[in-house]
Amino acid sequence: DLDTPDLPGVLQGVQIHDGPPHGSQLQRVAIIEDHAMKTWAVTASVVHPGIGMKDTAERARYGEALAGLLDVAGRTEKVDEILFMVRTVPEDGAERDLWVNRHRRPNAPELSEVVNSDLAHGLTQASVRTETFVTIVVPETRIARSAKESGGGFEGRCRELYLLMGEIEAQLRGPMGMTQVRWLTSPELALACRTGFAPGDRAGIVEALSLREKDPSVNADVPWAMAGPSGADATVRHYSHDAWNSVSATIKLPTRGVAMGALAPILTPSEFGERRSFVVAYPIVSQSKADRQSGNAEWAADLAEGMNEKLGRKTRAKQRDEAHKARGLDAKLARGNSLTRPYGVCTVTVPTSMRITEFGRRLDASVRRAGFAPLRLDLAQDVGFAASTIPLGTSLTRSGDA
């Protein structure tokens, strides 16, 4: 069956459904059901103008907008996790080649042809494309009751997911400044998964899409049975898929914090043909669990300070910072904020003809240069790759009985 996903590793339990017609264009959004984790997810392709030329006040506003997005997701009491995925893919020049072939003039000057060809060749090797995805994950346990009130079954769950999509999209387009938010259909999601496993296949797919505009009989879609790799091998230090190797590492936020945009060096490839990708996940802790954790942390901080005073010991700076953080967390929860414990995973992908160990060391160096501490996901490289490269809502913190 070409509609059944054939994906390796942790993605084996994923099933893709076509949701009911949605929006003004009546698109059938792809609904991702993970039978192993018992979750539902939807993925959107987004476009953001970036913050490279923004001043401090503008960046602070974007930070507040992200916090507002997490608060909105937490108040729904349904969204379990929000994942932001970015992939910087080497430019293959497929769109430019198609445009040049359509607009080429037979009487063009020969020198102009040579200059443009040389410029295209040089700029293509030095350019990258950025793909950004946002995925919201909803556990079955949180949506089952409300889905029953909305009609029950698969359609009831889709109605609840569509309501959540509307709330999240309003935050993305408004305070966060996204210029485009497009919820992916099943063929579009299959294309994103296929180019995640094999970045080199994109040029052929783009050409097929161009030919389909002239000849509707051309099949430019990627079946889900072919969206995964033809072969995958999870070794100790890297992950092999088709003719590509990948190395994944988690990143830990330093105690002193970092400036917004500090992840940029991680996304900068060091050589032509190298792809970088990372995902920043925001698992949202339920309000009751957050209150319990905050109360325990504040009680532990008060107990530690009391013991130090009774024994005549001096409270260290690290202990004072942790106590201040615990009390500040309780105050923020009392004001209605949500508690999240974000984490990030970054991945580098290169062809098998290039040494993956060398590019893994370069990835670690980029992480340290950005101000973070890298931790290789040895023995779990396949999970790290799926979480940071394939936009299907794979998480590193969610258990199978969630």
Task: Describe each region flagged by the PLM.
Residues D1-A402:
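Extended, folded cores of ATP/NTP-driven motor/assembly subunits in large transport
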